[in-house]
């Protein structure tokens, strides 16, 4: 019996030692306090702020003179990163409390040309338990005006914008995560839409070790080709004074497209489920006599056809980039915001890309643009920096990386056909079997640019890529919901009950209504 007592005593000492070690480990998890992070030595930059943010504290939003309330408490760290002498990258890292942290890091991308830390998306990420970081891509906006003159005379800032800012932000974030929590993150993910999608794919291609999983929405990855498409549309609508399509005529165009294609999926609901199968011919809209709100003049019809077809090199006959699908022309803040009108966003962005990025001329006139000449020059001179359309993702895939692409079919900013083209390029380059091991594309019917529109636009692609990376369970569909307020996913506001749910099927499959049950419920659809 004595030897049993000795064993029992030894066992008790072992258990006590284990408990002590666990206690020490727990005590060291946050051994670096939030305030102490302000003194942390940072290579290639300096920390400008390290402070606690309490729930309901106001988070400033630049360049707007406003803010939004924090939904949870966290440690806010702001830094200035200077990888070169001409670099000024403002970035932030938000660290949830140790007991709230899910053990993962989420980098978030920007929209437009960046110019401000994407605090809206970071707010949603930290509320879900992620340590999250974002940056301004190396330049600072002072207003909401679309301008790119900050790059003139600053080639290093163009590199920061194109790819470097997100990479050095990921490096600094991981360093401080380990210091704050006492250990590194379990997984690192990145999510971005629009230019953020461009950033996401640049990370996968140029820095495949930065992230374990990436979500790229509506990616502006073929940057120079997309810009050429923007310019093509601007020129088409300004070919003659009569070429402009007024906003008042968009309803007639959409009505005609829906009449031809809405019912193809078995449900007539104002949403074309698969616009790729819609071969809309707008010729019936040609005015028979006098101009009117329900018809198009010949110059307007010519311009519309060019928007649908996409830019073509007149010298070679080769298509430079795809055009836009039909059926969503009259949606608010869609074609009216992005395509038509002298101050459309497409025109504003294209004029800056070619005027500032390519020609370094703040007074450049778009009427001097030659598509064949200038698009080729853009591809040669700035394309190698800006384009993240390389389909060879073998280094990312070899690390076990997972990629989810998504796009709204009603997107009037980045053509959905361009994202499909990139997905097919990956399949061709890497082989379909290999591509299926790490990449999926989800098309969202009725969703506009990144969110909004009549279709379900709220879905958690980050959770899907996390599940895929952690458990090797590839997503074959995403559950998408439509709420009364589309911004609910961004703001973190309680969305209430969804108005519509639908499955987003892994491309090329499309959701089809079974013919029974409510067409507003996802369970009544199948992917095929």
Where are these regions (language model features)?
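Alpha/beta-hydrolase fold nucleophile elbow
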Residues: 183-194
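Catalytic-loop region of hydrolases
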Residues: 28-104, 119-120, 267-272, 281-364, ...
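Histidine-bearing beta->alpha loop at or near hydrolase active sites
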Residues: 438-452, 466, 484-486
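Bacterial N-terminal signal peptides
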Residues: 13-26
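A catalytic-pocket lid/entrance helix-loop region that shapes and gates access to the active site
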Residues: 158, 202-204, 209-312, 443
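Cap/lid segment of the alpha/beta-hydrolase catalytic domain
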Residues: 102, 111-185, 228-229, 236-239, ...
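Glycine-rich nucleophile elbow surrounding the catalytic serine of serine-hydrolase chemistry
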Residues: 116, 192-202
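Short beta-strand/loop motif that positions the catalytic acidic residue
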Residues: 405-407
